[in-house]
Structures are given as structure tokens and as C-alpha cells.
């Protein structure tokens, strides 16, 4: 029996926002094109609003939120909102359920944005997309909120604490997939110390015990997420699985299942790779994935 698949992370929105002549229906352009998702049995997909740390990040995030809404309006035969009604009628529809997320809070607030502007940006994004699957404070690098996964010695900053305060009670999980270890520790400590009702997950991360990479979760953080009833999305990128062994994907899935079989998921992280600058990273994905 083929079970419906829900995937916790793809970068279709940033692809549509930044790549000329981007087409979500062209399987030759991106691995999360709609035909690929349908062929793979994906019935529900989280679509990240991804931005890097740039002065124009807030504008780019708003553009991607508009694209998310436009997909729903222009292609109702293909996509619908991933909500309770969709899940209830999953077996009777051919549509793909979609929900947005925010990958890097630089899209909520750039380095020079005032807090009035940050709150307004967050509220506007949430109003546009309707709901958010999760928010990550950082990506690879540092921003005003904290340290990304490739930073050293940078944890949760004061602005990060203030943003967590604003998220409290909104039922939007915080994502640890792109945090430094120090930032992950800071987020968890701050949530506990101030009794903030914020769920925690890792949308597209693997396990450092299987493959030693800074983008992967330590056992400590993986177990902490499970302890908080969060979920772990296994990432399909070769760099985070194993440089040589495609079957390592299965090891990450099995390892996560042993932590909690109800808490493991896919977080494939399919993005536009045709302009990826580092030749050592190719192939980005094993054919197995």
C-alpha cells in the first residue's frame, strides 16, 4: 500500500521569485516541481519563504508570500491549503496541500528594520499565507537574531529573544535546522526559562551521530525535540547524508525512527541547483533520493 507523503521543506517559492522563467510544472528545472511531487506520492508540502541576510530580504519574503497565494489562486486543480479540511478529505482529492514556512527571520527583519516594521512584516506575512508551519531564526550565517549553522560562538541574541516573545502563543513552531549549537541551546533555554508556549522541531536536518556535519543535529538536540513532541525531517542533500554512500539516507531514517517512530518525517530540501557555485557539492542529491 502506498501511503501519502508529507514533506517538511522545499524551496519552490524562492525559485519562483528569483529564477527567470521559473516554472513550477517543469520537472527539468527543480526537483520539487509539481509533476515530481505527484509522481513521488507527496500529498502535502511545506514551502519555505527563504531569504539570505541582505537589505532587501524583507521585500523578497513578501514577494514569496505573494507567490504562495498566487499558486493557490491560479492552480486550484493542483494545490490547496494544507489545513484540517484538506487532511479530512485527503483520500477524495487529487490536490497537493501546501503550507508556508519562514526559513531565516531576516525576511521578517533586516539589520536596520525597526521593531514596529518587524512586527508589521511578520503580521503581514502571516495574514497573506494564512498559517505558518514553522519559523527558523537563521540560515547558514549570522543575523540580528542569532548565529546560523556555520557560525561559531554566536547564540541567541537579544533581538532573537524578543522575536521568541512575539511568537509565544501563536502556535507556530521554531525550527532548529539552521541554528548553531549555541543558538539551539539558547532557544531551548529561553523557552523553558520564560515558560513560552512555542513548539520546537527540525524541519530538514539529519543526525550528527551518523554523519558528522554542522548542519546535522546532535543527539542532545534531537532528543530534546522529541521530548517536546516535535518532529524531525530527514534531509536528502548528499552533503548532509554521506559524501559517498547513498544508502546512508536509510540509516538516518532508521536512527530517527528509533528515537521516536512517530516523530520522524521527510524534509527533502529540494531547491534550484542549476546555478550552484561549488562543484564539489555536485551531485547535490544521490539518484536514490
Model-derived regions, located:
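Aromatic-anchored, glycine/proline-accented short structural segments
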Residues: 187-221, 225-228
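Short, glycine/acidic-enriched loop or turn micro-motifs at the edges of active sites
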Residues: 10-12, 178-181, 207, 272
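N-terminal hydrophobic targeting/anchoring segments and the immediately downstream early-domain regions
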Residues: 1-156, 161-162, 169, 212-229, ...
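Loop-centered beta-sheet repeat module
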Residues: 152-189, 194, 200-205
Amino acid at each position: 500500500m502506498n501511503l501519502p507523503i508529507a514533506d517538511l521543506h522545499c524551496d519552490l517559492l524562492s525559485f519562483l521569485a528569483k529564477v527567470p522563467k521559473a516554472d513550477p510544472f517543469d520537472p527539468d528545472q527543480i526537483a520539487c516541481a509539481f509533476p515530481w511531487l505527484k509522481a513521488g506520492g507527496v500529498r502535502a508540502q511545506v514551502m519555505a519563504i527563504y531569504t539570505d541576510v541582505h537589505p532587501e530580504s524583507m521585500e523578497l519574503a513578501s514577494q514569496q508570500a505573494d507567490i504562495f497565494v498566487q499558486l493557490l489562486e491560479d492552480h486550484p486543480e493542483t494545490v490547496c491549503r494544507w489545513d484540517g479540511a484538506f487532511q479530512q478529505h485527503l483520500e477524495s482529492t487529487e490536490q497537493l496541500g501546501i503550507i508556508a514556512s519562514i526559513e531565516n527571520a531576516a525576511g521578517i527583519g533586516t539589520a536596520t528594520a525597526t521593531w514596529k516594521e518587524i512586527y508589521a512584516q511578520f503580521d503581514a506575512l502571516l495574514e497573506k499565507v494564512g498559517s505558518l508551519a514553522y519559523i527558523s531564526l537563521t540560515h547558514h550565517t549570522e543575523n540580528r537574531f542569532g548565529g546560523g549553522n556555520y557560525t561559531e560562538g554566536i547564540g541567541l541574541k537579544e533581538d532573537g529573544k524578543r522575536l521568541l516573545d512575539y511568537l509565544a502563543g501563536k502556535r507556530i513552531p521554531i525550527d532548529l535546522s539552521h541554528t548553531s549549537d549555541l543558538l539551539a541551546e539558547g532557544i531551548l533555554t529561553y523557552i523553558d526559562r520564560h515558560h513560552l508556549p512555542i513548539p520546537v522541531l527540525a524541519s530538514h536536518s539529519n543526525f550528527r551521530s551518523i554523519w558528522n556535519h554542522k548542519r546535522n543535529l546532535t543527539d542532545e538536540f534531537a532528543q530534546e525535540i522529541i521530548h517536546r513532541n516535535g518532529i524531525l525531517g530527514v534531509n536528502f542533500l548528499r552533503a548532509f547524508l554521506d559524501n559517498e554512500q547513498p544508502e546512508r539516507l536509510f540509516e538516518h531514517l532508521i536512527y530517527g525512527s528509533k528515537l521516536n517512530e512517530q516523530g520522524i518525517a521527510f524534509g527533502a530540501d529540494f531547491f534550484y541547483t542549476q546555478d550552484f557555485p561549488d562543484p564539489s557539492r555536485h551531485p547535490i542529491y544521490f539518484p536514490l533520493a
